[in-house]
Each structure stands twice: as structure tokens, then as C-alpha cells.
UniProtKB/Swiss-Prot annotation:
Presence of the UniProt keyword Nucleus in the record: no
A molecular function GO annotation: tRNA binding
Protein name from the UniProt record: Isoleucine--tRNA ligase
Keyword terms: Aminoacyl-tRNA synthetase, ATP-binding, Cytoplasm, Ligase, Metal-binding, Nucleotide-binding, Protein biosynthesis, Zinc
Short motif ('KMSKS' region): ranges: 600-604
Entry-linked CDD domains: Anticodon_Ia_Ile_ABEc, IleRS_core
Cell compartment(s), UniProt: Cytoplasm
Primary location class: cytoplasm
Length: 1047
């Protein structure tokens, strides 16, 4: 029976092609389904998918959250959990309606109503599934495993019934109420917005800032002074109802000799400017209460007396004049104050943002555009004191970007303020990544919580399940079954959307009323839909009761940082309102993805990266790695072809090249893992070091992912892969050529473990490596890396002392390379010796000495102390930057002591740790970074020192060393020729060479056995080659010509 063998691994890899092959493998072998089946019965680890809306095409930013929503479920599955992954679609809401309105060429609600609500909603239903194929393609292509065959949809009747049930629960708690309040209103869409929607749409604009005279008509100043009032919304002056003054603020009369104006005392100079003096007359706001004034416009009628000074605690003296114009139809504080005084609420602006047609001057004008006409009229009538452009942040609709107005009208609210303390308590239990969000962005949001404006005067959404009769009785319905009982007809197949639900009436069931109850016309905020997904995705409580209860709350959710005002908030709010418990325990907030130029991706800038072409150019693994580990996930990051290609070059290709190297030499030598391989304890020190580092890596990566830190996990893995390739493999290359079982077994174990560790981050390339290097040679191995378990770190196998020694070895090698480069002696030229001075060298494992001598290409290695005399002239001076922090003004005295000390003794002491000097009779201890040591090599030596370590190279090159150097030059040339001839690395060759340089002839003759061994030559001889040999290779610097052929 043929022994197991690695599959052949190509040296060059086409990552996108590899990934498409892996996708085929997953699909054909149903690997995702098997991962779910395999983990059935294990502890649940619950993840919720935040539903996207598929009425638009996905962009590169959609990849980001999906990466995190795939990495952690894969990781937890490998850790022994069952992780169900149910996809979902967000179907309702204003964004969908706006897109359909645009398609149909509509300009507002009146067009929709004329077209027909049923027809319009049918178009909405069609639009939200229009691009599901594109989202599913993205999901599949990037390797995001989620169940697309059974997704939840917020528009499905069963989902809506669950939402109704939750609203009835809230209603029964007295927390779903109707109130007349001022709330954000979009005049384009003619609907209200919730506070969390409002937070998503601020834009910087310039508004007119006007100071207006309100002549007093009663009180001690009547007829001889005016109140000076400041506002940035001149259009609201049409419905001015009162002027608010703080009861405890002192207001003064100021004059310029021509008129008198009343302003708050602290604001005289700021509001009036130069040339104004106070008259000495002062009044508190309380004393001014009910002074009447002439209103700025008489364009609308008032049904009751108004236009006098009222007192309000919210008035400040930070800006303006300390007197605040009140228009209760357009301001929350205004409405509250005016209600206390019984003042009327007059609203001349229609729901589309235009003034009523019969309003003089501005009838039919959009509220923002009315400012100019009104300001001009105030100017003409002598009421405008001054007009200054004012730049500020103003709320706009987060979808259509229309300027919002605050609008008083009856709406339905969820009293989230009643559960504010519970929300704060649940937030304390939640783990936020980054942690700063808990008490920062999200905590502030909860602390400033306002009631949730739930109702929307729109069409495509979950209908508000409230029916009311003429007597004002309210009935909240929780299901279609309940509706069937109330109507006495079967409503089980009813489409619960408008307009069908609007036609359902029943006899009011309350107190024997019996009057006809009709549904209120509103739908609900679509954010409530998505916030209900933990239970509504299962149709709870009408089915899947046990399933939901086993999967609530989620252990993990992840979306972009702006969802602190969106889904993160609504999930916590709905969960707390309905179940008295937040819907999640751990949440990863992600920064936004920017274009490579640092700007936001947008169509008009032409900098959008299409996700599928991006992955088909660089590979999904590279994009995933960048999203997960290319910088802090919670900071805004720039993504482009350059950043993705860097991931390919630095990490993925390094990993692949190591795998290809292992496969090549294992196949060449016919090796496969077996019990006959040397045990770890019997392997060379370099192998033992690598295995120790592997177990440390496994422990650290596990901790990082347990802490939701993909950046740290990625950094650890990338650094390890680099060390693996550029230190271990490079230092062990000769052993692999020789088929060394210890080296092959060690690298196999490392590749298998690293492949498992990388699998959640880069599922494609690791799958291919598993199929090529693990599955074929490992009896009982799972058929996919994603069916494998997570590696367990053996902490007892970690050797901190060996790790410390290898750090020292590599540090000395780095110093040796640096001093050789500075000397100009090329690396291939052997030198006789290197001398080392550093703490810990004496205890260094003798095997590690060989690593240093081979790397530095020296014959011997010894401690500098073993050689008599010094190889350098040493000077020492104070590092003022470091010492200044410790000694301040006393640094000069320390510097003088350092300059006067024995520099060589200081250098020696600092290598061991610290040094000391006498300063004004006291001993001062100095650290290595506080003294600058300069060592000038003696002639014939090259010396490099850094932080207490010194490496010296003896530069004397004997004839024997020179010949060895020439031999190494020849080896390099022949190896290049082998590569260019298309030979396999294991192919044996025959070679003939000639040279006109006596030194070269002597060198190649003396070292012929070494050269032949290095270049795999079975026949290496001086002389002319016959026609069976290939084309000649010539190197003029060596006066060397050679020809080779396969042996």
C-alpha cells in the first residue's frame, strides 16, 4: 500500500482562483451544513445578524461587518459551541418608500395616495428583494457562512405578528401612549422621526441669525422700550406666541441715545455692540412676567390672548439676548412653557413644510425659504436690529437630506424614559468593544434618553396594531388570531399591511361599548422591526418558544459605530421593555470604511470599491484580513487596492510559500508524519524553540479572539508567520534539503496548528492548505479545517528561557549584519571570528552559537571578555532627553559626572543592566537609555553596539577565507543557473566549469566537494563541456564559465 503523501502545492498561487475552487468544495460537500450538524447538542453560542435592506446594491463597506460576523461564529464553532446563523432582511421603512417614489416619479404622499396604497406597497415589496441575489453573491464570495435558505424577513406576516405581540406587551404596561408633542418632522416625506433617527442626519448649514425689536405695550417701559429677541429661525416668528425670560436673571435697559432696548445684563456688550450704555433701570425676569408686547408679524389669527413675557428656567445667558422667542408649534421647550401658561398653539405650516396658502407674504412658501422675505419685511418696518449669517449643525432627514422642522402634533410614543434606569443597568452588564463606547457614545445616549416616537404617517411598514372607537377606547391587538376573535371572521390569511389592515373593523370590546373600532392610520418606525428580530425571527411567542428562549440574549452582535443610535439601541430598548433584559451581551462597534484617499466612498466622487471585483482581484481572504486585522477595527480605516495587496504580500504569500516549501521537500524525500519521527524533546534546539513559540502563539491568539480583538490576533499570527519563514525555515533550509525528519515533522505540526488558528480569519487559503497538507496524511482528520477543533495550547511546552535566548541570538545576528554591512564586506565572504559582549551570552545554549556563526558567516564565536585588550575606543555622554525628565535642573551635574567617568567601565556596566556615577557626593544609578555610548573600532575590526550589546567582527581575510568566499560566490551563481534552467529543486546535475583566474581555480578545486553538495551535483569537474550540457553561464567578476545538465 502506497504511504500517504502531501498533495503537490504550486510555488505560485492565484488566490482568487484558489478561493473559487474552495467555494465549489464547500458547496459540493455541504461543509457549512456539516459544521452545524456536527455541533448539534453542544452549548449554544448565540449570534444575531443585523438585517440589511436589499433594495440597493452592496458596497465594499458591507464586507466589514460581515467579516466580524463570520470570524467569531467560526472561532466559537471550533471552540466547541453550536452557533446557529440565520440570515435576515430588513424590508420596511422610509428608505424603501423613497426609492420606489423616485422610480415612479412621485413627489410626495399625495401621489402615492392617488396611485393607490396597495399598488404602492406591492412595488415596495418587490423592491426589497430586488438585489437579494447580489447580497447573496457577496455573502458567498467572501466566505460568510449564514443560512440564506431560511432567512427572516421583517415584512412576513409571522414576523409582524411577533412585533404586534411585543407592542401589546408594552401597551399593557402603560408604556405605549399617544401624546401631543413637538418632534422631528420631515416635510418631504411628511412623517415624524425618532430621536435615534434624528442623530444620524446632522448637516452644517448657514441660517440667518436675526435680532428683532418687540416693542413693549404694557409694564413700566410700555411705549418707550422694546425687548430685543434673537432667533435663527425667522420663519417661526409668524406664529410667535410669547417671549421667555429667566425669572432670576437681571435684565437692563440700554440706550444709544435714540432708542431703548431690554436685554439680559451679562449680554449687553455681546448683543448690542459699541455705543450702548445702560440707563440704570433693571428688572428681574420674574418682575417682567406678563408684560405685553407688539408681535413681530400679524399674519395669522390667535384664538386666545397671547404675546406677553413668560418665565422659563431653560433660558440662558450664554448667547443671544437672554430673551427667547416662543413658538410652541415648533419647539419642545416652547410647547412645555406655553402649556403652563395656557397659551394657544398656532401652526401655520402644513405637513409638507409650506405655509398655509392664506398666510399673507409667505403663503405656499417652504419654511426655510420664507426666512428671506420675512427678514426683509422686518427690515422695512424698522423691527430688525441686526442680521448676521449663522453657521451651525442642523438636523436633516437621514435618508432624503431635507431640512427637518420640529413639529407639534399627536403621535404615538413608547415611554423609554420610564425604563431609563433599567437600560443603564443593562448597559453596565454589556461588554462593549471598544470599552469607551459603554460610558461614552452609547452611555451618553441612554443618559439623555427621550421617549421613542414610534408612529410614522407612512405606508410601507408594520401597521400600528391599535384600534380606537368614537368613545376613545383603545384596543391593542397582538395577532391575527386575536383579530379573528374580535371580528368574528377568519383573519389568518390576512396580509397585515396597509391598506388591507385598514379595512378591518370590529365592535369595541371595552366596557360593553360596542361602537365600531377602526385602526389608527400610522405604521411604526422600521427600527422597531429590526430591534424585534431576536424573537420575531422565530415567530415568538406563537411558535418556537423553547428555541427562542434557548437563544436569548445573543452572546455577540457587531455593526458599524453609528448603530449606537440605531440597531444597538433598539435591540437593547425592545429587549428591556419586553423581557426586562437586553438582547445582547457583547457588541463589537466598527469604524467606517473610507476610500484610499481618506474620503467617504460615494458615487459622485467615483471612489467606490465594488466588493466582488475587489475580491476577484486580490482574493476574499486578503480583504477579510484587512478588515479584521489591518488597523484598529473601531477606527475609521482607508481601504484600497494598495492596502489589500500589502496583506497578500506580507502575510498570505509568506504563509503560502512556507506551505509550498514544506510540501516540496516532504514529497521529494517521501516523508509523511509517523510515530517514528523524533519526539519534540529529542529534536534540535531550533525545533524546540519553534514549538514553544507555537504554543505561546496559540494561547495568545485564543485570548485575543476570546476578547474580540481580531487586530491583536492578526498581528500575532502575521509576526509568527514572518518568523517561521524568515528565521526558522531559512535557518533550517539545509536540513529540509537533506530530508531531516525532525525538521519536516516540526514544520508540519506548526503548519497544521497555524492553519487552524488562521481559519476563522482566512477560511479559503487555510482550507486549501488543510486539503493539501493535513487531510491526506492525517488518519481521522476532519474533511475540512472548518470541521476541525481549535488547537489547545500546552502551557507546559512553553519555554520562556529558550524564547529569551533566541531573542538574544537574533539581536546579536542583527548587530552582526549591521556591522558587516557598514564594513563593506559582503555576507558571502567568510570571516574568522566574531566577538560578543552582552549579558546572558555565557549561558547561551551551545547549539544557538552555531545559529549565530552560520548567520554571520564566521568561523568562530567568543565572548569579548575572553580576548585581551579592547577592540574599541569608548566615549560616554549623557542622554539629556532621557535624564532631563528625572533630574530637571540637576541634569548638568549628572552630565558632568558621566563625562568624567571611565567610559569603558560605564559601557561594561550598562551591558549588565545599570551603571552608577557620583554626583555631589551621592550615587546616581543610570539605565542604558540614559547614557549614549560611542565605540570606535580599532583598525581591522568592525564593531556595532546597541542598548548594552556589542558585536565585533575580525575583518582580516586570509587566503583560506578568500577562497571560501569565492566558493560561496560560485554556489550562488550555480543556484541561480539551476533556477533559470527550470530544474526541480530536487534534481541532481552534472556540471563543467572553466576559469582564467588562478584564485578562482584554486578556490573551486579546494572546495569542490562543498560546492557539489550545495548545488546537488553528482558530477562537478573542471573542463570543457560536450553538447549534452546546456547553454553556458558566465560571470565576468569571477572569470568563470560553466554549463550544466540534469544528471
Amino acid at each position: 500500500m502506497k504511504p500517504p503523501q502531501y498533495r503537490q502545492v504550486p510555488a505560485q498561487v492565484d488566490l482568487p482562483a484558489l478561493e473559487h475552487a474552495v467555494l465549489d468544495f464547500w458547496r459540493e460537500q455541504k461543509i457549512f451544513a456539516k459544521s452545524l450538524e456536527q455541533s448539534e447538542g453542544r452549548p449554544e453560542w448565540v449570534f444575531y445578524e443585523g438585517p440589511p435592506t436589499a433594495n440597493g446594491m452592496p458596497g465594499a463597506h458591507h464586507i466589514e461587518a460581515r467579516v466580524f460576523k463570520d470570524v467569531f461564529p467560526r472561532f466559537r464553532t471550533m471552540r466547541g459551541y453550536h452557533v446557529a446563523r440565520k440570515a435576515g432582511w430588513d424590508c420596511h421603512g422610509l428608505p424603501v418608500e423613497l426609492a420606489v417614489e423616485k422610480e415612479l416619479g412621485f413627489s410626495g404622499k399625495q401621489d402615492i395616495e392617488a396611485y393607490g396604497i396597495a399598488e404602492f406597497n406591492a412595488k415596495c415589496r418587490e423592491s426589497v428583494t430586488r438585489h437579494t441575489d447580489a447580497f447573496e453573491e457577496l455573502t458567498s464570495r467572501m466566505g460568510y457562512w449564514t443560512d440564506l435558505n431560511d432567512p427572516y424577513r421583517t415584512m412576513d406576516p409571522e414576523y409582524i405578528e411577533s412585533v404586534w405581540w411585543s407592542l401589546k406587551e408594552i401597551f399593557n404596561k402603560g408604556l405605549l401612549v399617544q401624546d401631543y408633542r413637538v418632534a422631528p418632522w420631515c416635510p418631504q416625506d411628511e412623517t415624524g422621526l425618532s430621536d435615534h433617527e434624528l442623530a444620524q442626519g446632522y448637516e452644517t448649514i448657514v441660517d440667518p441669525s436675526v435680532y428683532v425689536r418687540f416693542p413693549l405695550t404694557s409694564g413700566p417701559l410700555a411705549g418707550r422700550a422694546a425687548l430685543l429677541v434673537w432667533t435663527t429661525t425667522p420663519w417661526t416668528l409668524v406664529s410667535n406666541t410669547a417671549v421667555a425670560a429667566h425669572p432670576d436673571v437681571t435684565y437692563v435697559v440700554a440706550t444709544n441715545g435714540e432708542e431703548k432696548l431690554v436685554v439680559a445684563e451679562p449680554l449687553v456688550e455681546k448683543a448690542l455692540g459699541e455705543g450702548w450704555e445702560t440707563t440704570g433701570e433693571t428688572f428681574t425676569g420674574a418682575e417682567m412676567e406678563r408684560w405685553t408686547y407688539q408681535r413681530p408679524f400679524e399674519l395669522v389669527e390667535f384664538p386666545a390672548p397671547a404675546h406677553y413675557v413668560v418665565n422659563a428656567e431653560y433660558v440662558t445667558t450664554e448667547d443671544g439676548t437672554g430673551l427667547v422667542h416662543q413658538s410652541p408649534a415648533f419647539g419642545e421647550d416652547d410647547l412645555k412653557v406655553c402649556r403652563e401658561y395656557g397659551l394657544p398653539v398656532v401652526n401655520p405650516v402644513r405637513t409638507n413644510g409650506t405655509f398655509e396658502e392664506d398666510v399673507p407674504l409667505v403663503g405656499g412658501v417652504f419654511f426655510k425659504k420664507a426666512d428671506e422675505k420675512l427678514t426683509e419685511d422686518l427690515q422695512n418696518r424698522g423691527l430688525l436690529f441686526k442680521h448676521i449669517p449663522y453657521e451651525h449643525s442642523y438636523p436633516h432627514c437621514w435618508r432624503c437630506h431635507t431640512a427637518l422642522l420640529y413639529y407639534a402634533q399627536p403621535s404615538w410614543y413608547i415611554r423609554t424614559t420610564a425604563v431609563k434606569d433599567r437600560l443603564l443597568q443593562e448597559n453596565e452588564k454589556t461588554n462593549w468593544f471598544p470599552e469607551s463606547v459603554k460610558h461614552g457614545r452609547f452611555g451618553d445616549w441612554l443618559n439623555n434618553n427621550v421617549d421613542w416616537a414610534l408612529s410614522r404617517s407612512r405606508f410601507w411598514g408594520t401597521p400600528l396594531p391599535l384600534w380606537t372607537c368614537e368613545e376613545g377606547h383603545l384596543t391593542c391587538v397582538g395577532s391575527r388570531a386575536e383579530l379573528s376573535e374580535l371580528t368574528g371572521t377568519d383573519q389568518s390569511n390576512l396580509d397585515p399591511h396597509r391598506p388591507f389592515i385598514d379595512a378591518v373593523t370590529f365592535a369595541c370590546p371595552q366596557d360593553g361599548c360596542g361602537r365600531t373600532a377602526t385602526r389608527v392610520p400610522e405604521v411604526i418606525d422600521a427600527w422597531y422591526d429590526s430591534g424585534s428580530m431576536p424573537f420575531a425571527q422565530w415567530g415568538y411567542p406563537y411558535k418556537n418558544k423553547e428555541l427562542f428562549e434557548s437563544r436569548y440574549p445573543a452572546q455577540f452582535i457587531s455593526e458599524a459605530i453609528d448603530q449606537t443610535r440605531g440597531w444597538f439601541y433598539t435591540l437593547m430598548a425592545v429587549g428591556t421593555l419586553v423581557f426586562d433584559k437586553s438582547s445582547y451581551e457583547n457588541v463589537v462597534c466598527l469604524g467606517h470604511i473610507l476610500a484610499e484617499d481618506g474620503r467617504k466612498m460615494s458615487k459622485h466622487l467615483g471612489n467606490i470599491l465594488q466588493p466582488i471585483p475587489l475580491m476577484d482581484q486580490h482574493g476574499a481572504d486578503a480583504v477579510r484580513w484587512f478588515m479584521a486585522a489591518g488597523g484598529s477595527p473601531w477606527a475609521a480605516r482607508r481601504v484600497g487596492h494598495g492596502t489589500i495587496q500589502e496583506v497578500v504580500r506580507k502575510t498570505l504569500l509568506t504563509y503560502w510559500n512556507t506551505v509550498a516549501f514544506q510540501a516540496l521537500y516532504a514529497r521529494t524525500s517521501g516523508w509523511a508524519p509517523s510515530e517514528a519521527d523524533p519526539a519534540p524533546a529529542d529534536r534540535p534546539v531550533l525545533d524546540r524553540w519553534l514549538l514553544s513559540e507555537l504554543h505561546a502563539l496559540t494561547d495568545q491568539v485564543t485570548q485575543a479572539l476570546e476578547s474580540y480583538d481580531t487586530q491583536r490576533a492578526g498581528k500575532l499570527l502575521s509576526a509568527f508567520v514572518d518568523d517561521l519563514s524568515n528565521w526558522y525555515v531559512r535557518r533550517s533550509r539545509r536540513r529540509f534539503w537533506q530530508g531531516d525528519k525532525a525538521a519536516l515533522r516540526t514544520l508540519h505540526e506548526v503548519v497544521e496548528t497555524v492553519t487552524r488558528l488562521m481559519a476563522p480569519l482566512t477560511p479559503f487559503i487555510t482550507e486549501r492548505v488543510w486539503q493539501d497538507l493535513v487531510f491526506p496524511v492525517t488518519p481521522g482528520a476532519p474533511e475540512s479545517v472548518h470541521l476541525a477543533s481549535w488547537p489547545e495550547a500546552d502551557l507546559s511546552a512553553i519555554d520562556p528561557e529558550l524564547s529569551k535566548q533566541m531573542v538574544l541570538v537574533r539581536r546579536l545576528v542583527e548587530l552582526g549584519r549591521a556591522t558587516r554591512a557598514e564594513s563593506g564586506v559582503k555576507t558571502r565572504q567568510p570571516l574568522s571570528r566574531a566577538l560578543v559582549a552582552v549579558a546572558g551570552f555565557e549561558t547561551l545554549d551551545r547549539e544557538l552559537h552555531a545559529q549565530i556563526t552560520e548567520e554571520l558567516n564566521v568561523t568562530s564565536l567568543a565572548a569579548l571578555s575572553e580576548v585581551g585588550g579592547s577592540l574599541v575606543d569608548t566615549t560616554a555622554k549623557a542622554n539629556f532627553r532621557a535624564l532631563g525628565k528625572r533630574f530637571g535642573k540637576g541634569v548638568q551635574a549628572v552630565a558632568k559626572a558621566v563625562a568624567g567617568a571611565d567610559a569603558a567601565a560605564l559601557s561594561l556596566a550598562l551591558r549588565e543592566g545599570t551603571a552608577s556615577v557620583e554626583v555631589d557626593g551621592e550615587t546616581v544609578t543610570l539605565a542604558p537609555d540614559e547614557v549614549i555610548i560611542t565605540e570606535t573600532p580599532r583598525e581591522g575590526w568592525s564593531v556595532a553596539s546597541d542598548s548594552g550589546a556589542t558585536v565585533a567582527l575580525d575583518l582580516e581575510i586570509t587566503e583560506e577565507l578568500r577562497q571560501a568566499g569565492l566558493a560561496r560566490d560560485a554556489i550562488r551563481l550555480i543556484q541561480e543557473a539551476r533556477k533559470n534552467s527550470g530544474l526541480d529543486v530536487a534534481d541532481r546535475i552534472a556540471l563543467r566549469w572553466t576559469s582564467t583566474d588562478p584564485e578562482v581555480i584554486a578556490a573551486l578545486s579546494e572546495h569542490s566537494e562543498l560546492i557539489a553538495d550545495e548545488v546537488l551535483a553528482t558530477d562537478f569537474a573542471q573542463g570543457e563541456a560536450d553538447d549534452t550540457y546546456g547553454e553556458p553561464f558566465t560571470d565576468e567578476s569571477l572569470s568563470l564559465t560553466f554549463r550544466l545538465r540534469k544528471a
